[in-house]
């Protein structure tokens, strides 16, 4: 494999001049630049980026943690991150935690051992005191998750307001008994969403029952289970605000299968505005989340920190959400 030394000797220039051409440095004459580029092409020279990054103490790589790549929300988040890192000449490693605390800590070891320049956490499995010691090794950013103790940049959306908006929509449709679904019970983001649900009920002098609240619901099969729990209740909710569109689709599927009319017998709101909302019959009313932009913004902020142009001190960036009204309500 040819080296910079060989290119320099062939062109009768210094190694510094060759390096400047490789790095697109402006202070090289056009004549010398063309000569060096021709030699590089003839010798089929390929720069050793690994060695270069080692000298710079940078990997040009960011890690992204998600619980599962087959969930549509996180697939979109990965898409947003991947597009932006390519545009910025970085690479991304996607790490699945499967909602496991130890797996998340193993991801953070990549930062400690300088295998990545920064980490974007798409979920948060551990308490912050388990995460914060790794900040001395490089930047960490929370995306789609919150923690009150995290003294770093957090990019997400207003979970409280999104839930409040959805529940008020159901109330305005005439519903007085409204259920609620969420996924991880220890997530502060999910807690904020639940608070939005409860505040909407309170503001309209409505009450809820504990059996109308369903936790750890993630996918279509969980939606099946939610419906059957609702069906077996003596005092059923007439509407339900779900944690994501997959759960909403599962509820609707089983409701229709069991002779329920949606929304007449059971109104359903999803969350995320996934494509499944437009495939299911009836189509699903949902909360639209700018997931692609969420990923893009996370990349921009963490690269700013990696480059030394900005710190990731405590700040919360909230992207806008909106209610998309369809047939299920």
From Swiss-Prot:
Residues within the DNA-binding region(s): 4-23
Gene3D superfamilies: 3.40.50.2300, lambda repressor-like DNA-binding domains (1.10.260.40)
Ranges for domain HTH lacI-type: 2-56
InterPro entries linked to this entry: HTH_LacI, LacI/GalR-like_sensor, Lambda_DNA-bd_dom_sf, Peripla_BP_I
Recorded GO MF terms: DNA-binding transcription factor activity; transcription cis-regulatory region binding
Any one of the GO BP annotations: regulation of DNA-templated transcription
Acyltransferase keyword on record: no
Domain of life the protein comes from: Bacteria
A Pfam family that the UniProt record links to this protein: Peripla_BP_3
Keyword Transcription recorded: yes
Keywords, in A-Z order: Activator, DNA-binding, Repressor, Transcription, Transcription regulation
PANTHER family: LACI-RELATED TRANSCRIPTIONAL REPRESSOR, NTD BIOSYNTHESIS OPERON REGULATOR NTDR
Function description: Positively regulates the ntdABC operon and negatively regulates its own transcription. Binds to NTD to induce ntdABC transcription.
Entry protein name: NTD biosynthesis operon regulator NtdR
Species, as recorded: Bacillus subtilis (strain 168)
